[in-house]
Swiss-Prot record:
It is found in: Cell membrane. NCBIfam families: elast_bind_EbpS. Keywords: Cell membrane, Membrane, Transmembrane, Transmembrane helix. The gene is ebpS. InterPro entries: LysM_dom, LysM_dom_sf. The lineage of its organism: Bacteria, Bacillati, Bacillota, Bacilli, Bacillales. SMART domains: LysM (SM00257). Residues 146-165, 215-231, 267-290, 398-491 have a biased composition (Low complexity). This is Probable elastin-binding protein EbpS. Residues 1-322, 346-493 are annotated as: Disordered.
Amino acid sequence: MSNNNFKDDFEKNRQSIDPKEHQENTQDSVNDSVDNIKEEVSDKSDEQFPPRNAQRRQRRRDTATNQREDEQSNQEHHNENNEVGDRDNGLQHEDNSSRDSNADKESNDPSQNNNLIHESSNNQQSENRHDINNEKDQSDKDSNNKKGAVIASSGAAGVGAYAASKHNDAASSSKDHNDKAHQQNQDWEQSNQTNDSTETQDENTNNHDSKKKGAAVAGGAAAAGAGAYAAGKHKGKKDKNDNEPEQNESKSDVKNEEKHGSKKKGAAVAGGAAAAGTGAAAASHSKSSTGNGGNGNGGNGGNGNNGDNNHDSEDNNKKKGGLLGKLLPIIAAILILAAIGIFGGMALTGNNDDKGSDDDKKVADNKDKDSDKAKDADSDKDSKSDKDKDKAKDDDNNQATTDSDSSDSSDNANSDSDQGNNDSQDQANSDQNQGTQDEQNSQNNQDQQSDQSQQNGQANSNQNGSSDQSQNASNDSNQQNNQSSNSNSGQRTHVVNGQNLYRIAIQYYGEGTPENVEKIREANNIQGNDIHNGQRLVIPQ
């Protein structure tokens, strides 16, 4: 950091690009296929300087932070290996760690990276090989990460088989690195160096592989065919790597491409899976994990720094692979739970909507029933009011008829009394006149002859006969009046007030039958229903 304070902006910006950072940036924007990603990485691996402007400054910051973290992690891991190793070789391990730290500082220092004069040809070759191996391993890991994300998002069916095949591939790749490290350690043994660090490294690898195996077994469900296919495929790949050692970097590149193809096949087969092949995948992975101590590929001779760099990159890759192996089942479980929660919520809300619609229908039906009841009540009230009006009219008509009957009876009584009074007065007058005439005749005709008396007697008899006749006539008239009054009292009358014969018959007879209507017609000489308001009708008994 102190050296950067004395550099100008141009020298500060002349920093090399970390290939891992390149790999992550390019894979975020490219999603077509793994082959295209590898081609772009290989094309951009030769670039030494970032583009200018804002992207350059941002990449410079990210690169500086990533280099600092890598340096710390490599230093810590190397210190652990130094503590585990034998105390007899402690000085040599310290020398190796110092050389590794010097190599890391030289690679991290931008001035040292750009000043190619101070680097030896062996260091250049080892660092170039280290960068290429890191690029390919990182590309394989990122492609596997993308495949894992796609399969995990599609459901829990292919998670287990993919995790098993992925960790088998990680185990086979780590086995290749371990074989290289073992070969280099054998070269160091020829130069009076022990392989205690290699044995501890193998133990760490076995422990780490067992952890990954547990994560793969806990990862959930996969198909039986997919697990068996992945097991056979990677077992054959392990045997091939054990029996056919590779001698140069071109063959290792071909091996990585084939390995990547096998990963694609394993992921594709595991995509349509169910929950039966977890055991087979775990068994195949356990076989591949126990085979780490076999005959490894013979790498280039190189120097000690190359072996240490490969060793550090292996450990970093193993750590990242272990984290991914633990995270994949967790992500798949979260996705499954989220899908179950979504469908459950949809089902519950659907049921609630149905219940709400049923409640609305019930409320609407109740409202309709209430409205019908209200209408019925209104109609009942109207009918009652009509009946009350009819009763009031009938009562008025009955009262009118009773009034008319009473008036008729009073008129008849008055007429009878008047006639009786007249008759009595006439009879009294006639008797008085007769008496006076008799007295006059007796007084005036006392001296007349008997003839006159006879004539007077005849006249008196005639007068008496006429008076008797008048009295009989008056008696007959009285009898007729009595009969008429009796007939009037036996028959009823009705004054028409906006009614028809049917209503009148119902009022007086209780039934509107045609016989009752015909009685009223005959009594009043009516043809049809020809009546008018105010007409007085006789209602027979």
